[in-house]
Amino acid sequence: MVVLGDPQTYVKNTFSQPIFELMTAWTAAHKDALKIKAVLCTGDLVERNDTPTAFAQFRGDANGNAPSFAQWEFVARAFSRLDGEIPYVLCTGNHDYGYESSENRQTRFGDYF
C-alpha cells in the first residue's frame, strides 16, 4: 500500500502541483513491479475548500494559493491517473471543509470525486 499524506502542500500552489502529479504517475507506473495493491490518502486534499470572497475564489489569495476550484480540479486530475489501475481511498481533512470555523462543514469533495 502507498500512503499519500497531506497533498494540500503540493496542490495549493501551481508551481508545486507537478510534484504531486509525479507521485500519482510514479505509483501507477510501478504498481506491478512493487505489487502495489491500494493507495490511501490521509486527507487535506486541498489547502482551502472554498474561498470566502469572489476575488480570491478566482484569483487565489495573497499567500500564493491557487483558487479553491483550481486546487480541487488539480487534485482530482492527479488521482484520476489511478482510475482503473489501483484502488484508492481518499480521506478528507479539516482543510477540505469550511474555511474558518467548524460551523461550516460544507465540502466540495463530492463535486470532484
Residue ranges and their predicted role:
Residues 1-66:
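N-terminal active-site segment of His-dependent metallophosphoesterases
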Residues 52-113:
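Extended active-site neighborhood of metal-dependent phosphoesterases/phosphodiesterases
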